[in-house]
Amino acid sequence: MAGRRSSNVCPFPGNSGGGLEGPVPMRVDTPTWLSSQAATSRLMVRPGMGPGFCPGPEVWGVPLGPSPYEFRGGIAPYGAYETRTWSQNSSEDTYPGPYIALRYMPNLALPEDVSAIQKEMEQLAKELRQKRMTLGYSQADVGFAVGAMFGKVLSQTTICRFEAQQLSLANMWKLRPLLKMWLEEVDEKNLLGICRMEMILQQARKRRRASRERRIGSNLEKLFLQCPEPTPQQISYIAGRLRLQKDLVQVWFSNRSQMAGWPTNDSSQRENVGATGAPFPGPPVCFPLAPGLHFDFPHYGGSCLTPLYSSTPFPVRGALLSAPTTTLGLPRLSS
């Protein structure tokens, strides 16, 4: 297989880059790792995007797809190339997907007129916040949409600090091109950009919801293996930690018990477990967990989750229940 090389971006002859008032045509040399079907293509880049954003010769990405990805800065053709996952070491996340790697020009220093730049950043921060709230988007939505459209995902914290003008002027200047392009995309006159934004966010929400459901299901399965018949207090605690309704957790354990072949005709006895006390003598125990993990119930005045290997075994209908050797952890879910 041929070795990989970085793609080169250079302006067409005759374009000096100074004083231009529109998209600048750029030539993108096809890297060796692209398909042979891909010929040298053209990418329209707005003046100042490369020099004004990258702190140096850094590699950024343009999402691949079945049709040309159009935005108000121009057209980035793609679709006939091999997919290649691109990533970089940065404090920000990278949009998960294949990219055409592009190398932008080195960064330009801040203009000498700092006061004018500061006023521009203040105006941009206000405009960003106003547009985002008008459209009903969260700060995380804006950051993800920027990554989906332009190849660089910005975190919710970054958008929040930009709107509050808590970033340094240099960092705000670096984010300026991407955020201005996003504002142009969601302009009320650009219906195509707004529709594309909605599609991107819908797909993102579906992925986040599916990921959250997988984490919850995996955690509930671990809990079931350790305690197939939790008490009402345990169910309430699980629901609180997983941010679920108590009825959903109770139904899940009931259905899982039926799948595992556990008897379910003694529901009345199961409902009275909390009133009659723990199923075995000793202090109140919610779940047998691996050593080192303890959760506290505020109403019990101490640790309610004890290590598995205690002096009192955990009986389940006359049989001892073994527990996995790994430490059980509850996922941290984001709203």
Swiss-Prot record:
Please list the GO biological process terms of this entry. Answer: cell differentiation; meiotic cell cycle; regulation of transcription by RNA polymerase II; spermatogenesis
SMART domains in the record: HOX (SM00389), POU (SM00352)
- The residue ranges marked as DNA-binding region are 205-264
The POU-specific domain, residue ranges: 113-187
Identify the keywords attached in UniProt to this record, alphabetized: Developmental protein, Differentiation, DNA-binding, Homeobox, Meiosis, Nucleus, Spermatogenesis, Transcription, Transcription regulation
Subcellular location per the Swiss-Prot or TrEMBL entry: Nucleus
> Which Pfam families does its entry note?
Homeodomain, Pou
The record, for InterPro entries, names: HD, Homeodomain-like_sf, Lambda_DNA-bd_dom_sf, POU, POU_dom, POU_domain_TF
Task: Name the segments for region: Disordered.
Answer: 1-23
Q: Hey, what tissues is this thing expressed in?
A: Highly restricted to adult testis.
User: Chief subcellular site?
Assistant: nucleus
Q: Please name the GO terms that the record assigns under molecular function.
A: DNA-binding transcription factor activity, RNA polymerase II-specific; RNA polymerase II cis-regulatory region sequence-specific DNA binding; sequence-specific DNA binding
Top-level taxonomic group: Eukaryota
The record's Gene Ontology cellular component field reads: nucleus
Cystine pairings recorded for this chain: none
Q: Does the keyword DNA-binding apply?
A: yes
The entry's function note states: Transcription factor that binds preferentially to the octamer motif (5'-ATGTTAAT-3'). May exert a regulatory function in meiotic events that are required for terminal differentiation of male germ cell.
The record's listing under PANTHER family reads:
POU DOMAIN, POU DOMAIN, CLASS 5, TRANSCRIPTION FACTOR 2
Task: Write out the similarity annotation.
Answer: Belongs to the POU transcription factor family. Class-5 subfamily.
Q: What is this protein called?
A: POU domain, class 5, transcription factor 2
Task: Tell me what organism the protein belongs to.
Answer: Rattus norvegicus (Rat)
